[in-house]
Amino acid sequence: MSEIILTPKEQPEVPLEAPNIKPDVFAGKSIDEIRNIQIMHGNEVVKLGDFFEVSGEPADSAADIKIIIDGDVYNTKRIGQDMTAGEILVKGNVNMYVGAGMKGGKITVEGNAKSWAGQDMRGGELEIFGDAGDYVGSSYRGDWRGMSGGVITVHGNAGNEIGEYMNGGKIIIKGDVNIMPGIHMNNGLIIIEGNAVARVGGEMAGGTIVVKGMIEEFLPGFKYLGVEKDIEVNGETFPGAYYKFEGDHAIKGAKGMVYAAVGCNGHIEP
């Protein structure tokens, strides 16, 4: 796999909008042509080379390209947006919308990611080794169709409304989450290995949420179905005992499932 290295010169106060940082756009271009790729700085069209040193070996196919961003890009948005193949490695933090609309390939962020990571994701893999902000794997504002495929893994904590309007795929949060994970969820799987503050699965109609930690406050619209051990969801087994709830029956005909670890959630057992 050919590696193209982007070294940030300086992160400006006004964020960069850089959906063109992806293998699909770099494919078939020389290093000089990559330097001249357009990105946005506020309302101004600028060149990638104005803000990044560019080096490495180009390739003709997106699937054969790995983009390495060798530094912190905390004020660069939309990296990897709509990408279909190849890899991106970010050796630092990223701003909003990393991997939004992603359809294939892999993005790895070694630091933190701000809100809307993996928004409207269709496929591929997004892995964040730090924390993520709000709306991981959510829908576009005003839409009712969120993430429908792919896998998002956050090794740290995440914020509010992860998996909002989720329609498929899988989200794994290895730390804690804030309020309303899985709100309006229709399909897919959310795994929370830490704790959740409140309103898990609010107005969900389908899909599955597994919480291995504590749910501090649970919604009343879920029907308690008892305790299950070593549950299996989509071919994946979760050892241990879980309280099983169906809902959210604030939605007519809801068939969503929430599993909460027995050892942490005696306070929500009916």
UniProtKB/Swiss-Prot annotation:
GO BP terms: methanogenesis, from carbon dioxide
UniProt keyword terms in alphabetical order: Methanogenesis, Oxidoreductase, Repeat
Species, as recorded: Methanothermobacter thermautotrophicus (strain ATCC 29096 / DSM 1053 / JCM 10044 / NBRC 100330 / Delta H)
GO molecular function, one term: transition metal ion binding
Enzymatic reactions: N-formylmethanofuran + 2 oxidized [2Fe-2S]-[ferredoxin] + H2O = methanofuran + 2 reduced [2Fe-2S]-[ferredoxin] + CO2 + H(+)
EC number: 1.2.7.12
Subunit composition and interactions: This enzyme is composed of seven subunits FwdA (65 kDa), FwdB (53 kDa), FwdC (31 kDa), FwdD (15 kDa), FwdE, FwdF and FwdG.
Region (7 X 13 AA repeats of [GW]-X-X-M-X-X-G-X-[IL]-X-[IV]-X-G): 80-213
Cited SUPFAM superfamilies: Alpha subunit of glutamate synthase, C-terminal domain (SSF69336)
Gene designation: fwdC
Stated role: Catalyzes the reversible oxidation of CO(2) and methanofuran (MFR) to N-formylmethanofuran (CHO-MFR). Can only oxidize formylmethanofuran. This enzyme is oxygen-labile.
Family in the record: Belongs to the FwdC/FmdC family.
Upregulating conditions: By growth on tungsten or molybdenum under anaerobic conditions.
InterPro entries: FMH_DH_FwdC, Formylmethanofuran_DH_suC, Glu_synth_asu_C_sf
Sequence repeat windows: 80-92, 99-111, 118-130, 144-156, 163-175, 182-194, 201-213
Pathways per UniProt: One-carbon metabolism; methanogenesis from CO(2); 5,10-methenyl-5,6,7,8-tetrahydromethanopterin from CO(2): step 1/3
CDD domains noted in UniProt: FwdC/FmdC
Description of activity control: Not inactivated by cyanide.
Cross-referenced NCBIfam families: FMH_DH_FwdC (NF042910), one_C_dehyd_C (TIGR03122)
Protein name listed in UniProt: Tungsten-containing formylmethanofuran dehydrogenase 2 subunit C
